Amino acid sequence: VSWRAGSCHEFADLVVYVMRALGIPCGTDYMAMRGDNNVPHFWNFTLDKDGKTYITEFPDPNWKRAVSMYNPKAKVYRNTYGLNWKDVKRQQGKMMHPAFRKPLYQDVTAVYADSLNRDLVVSSDILCKEVHKGDIVYFCLSTRMDWVPIAWTVFEEDSLRFQDTEGSVIGCLATWNGKRLVMQSEPFTYDKMSGTIALLTPQSEKEDITLYFKFPLFCDLGILRMPGGVFEGSNDSQFRSADTLYYVKQ
């Protein structure tokens, strides 16, 4: 707290401590992976007298309706203290990815996606390897050079159905062999408005491109916090003695 630093997860934990100390019910919702970045995201929620979800997240101190969250998210979960027994029964004792082995969460995607909430239905035609009926298949989002599972379903005869999802993401399907994810499809775009997917199949021809930004600049919180910041240099790895190299004025 004194350093005013930390991740969104740590900030959400702090808000929970403060709210509960004041007698106000509060918890944490999260995306296992953002659709527009390479990291998960956590924030706080509370419920009004009608059971509607209101949220707050850094740096906005105001509370707003959950449906107003614009971030591409695919899936949203709510941290719980007890096991989600519905998911436990669905697993039927099968080998699961560690992220879903002990489901201490509730799926609240529909609360956030509202009218855009839909089941993602994928034909088995896009699977590039053999998957058997009853196998667990994961819907994954990317994180830098890897993939992270954010939802799972059981493979039926000729299709996969991931319940309660929102689009505007790039995903991929995978299975889990007990040690690592095994990719089972080409990456694909998942459109939020239509619910359709489009495979991103590698082409034989290559094209050179120039990238000017490492991350998108839209609503970049780092930019807003730069003024007043400094770049420092030091010969000491602990920075006990440091020189200011540059001061950010604007």
Please identify what each model-predicted range represents:
Residues 198-226, 231:
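Compositionally biased low-complexity segments at domain edges in trafficked proteins
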Residues 144-159:
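Short, acidic Ser/Thr/Gly-rich low-complexity loop/linker segments typical of extracellular
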Residues 225-250:
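Trp- and acidic/polar-enriched beta-sheet ligand-binding modules for extracellular glycan
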Residues 176-204:
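Structured interaction patches on ligand/partner-binding surfaces of diverse proteins
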Residues 92-119:
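Beta-strand-rich domain onsets/edges
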Residues 1-100:
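Hydrophobic/aromatic-rich core segments of domains that either
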Residues 118-130, 211-217:
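A short, amphipathic beta-strand motif
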Residues 49, 157-179:
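Short Pro-Gly-centered beta-turn/loop motif in secreted/extracellular proteins
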